[in-house]
Amino acid sequence: VREPTFFDRNHPGWLRYTLTDVFRLSQYLGIPFFPPNPDPIVQDMATRTIATDQPYIYRITRMGQAAARKGKSLAFCDEVSQLIWGGTANWHEGDHLKHAAERAGLDLAELDAIAASDAEALDAELAANQEALEMAGHWGVPTLVFQGEPFFGQDRIGLAIWRMEQAGLKERG
């Protein structure tokens, strides 16, 4: 959605390999991982075309940014991503998101209200985050940046921590 031509620019086999690799990695790490139901990004997987109407992704990204304003974006994203990718069918219905928000120390009704009433500002903040990501030297997620040095991918989190420790940072207790 951030990059509508993403799939057009990649090798046709990229998505198949990536999904194979992600499932393999989840098994290796012992992390539950299932195809999202529904996928937060509505798209035709056969043609790799991203739909114009996106009923899920804008809501959850705006709520994630609203959570960031409260200093709880990582907790919110962790809980919601476990719903989406952890096998919860119809994660967007019922109380699934409500309970995920509560586990993150947030109120879903409040996040939804902010996402609806302040959508333009939230979208601008998300666009600024995208610009900052590119200015840091990368374009994908997840990317961590420490002292101007980008670390792309979950497999680089340990490397980013190592670099922070080199700079004298200590883990908070």
Locate each region found by the language model.
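Structural alpha/beta surface segment adjacent to cysteine/selenocysteine redox centers
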Residues: V1-I84
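C-terminal cap of thioredoxin/glutaredoxin-like
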Residues: C77-G173
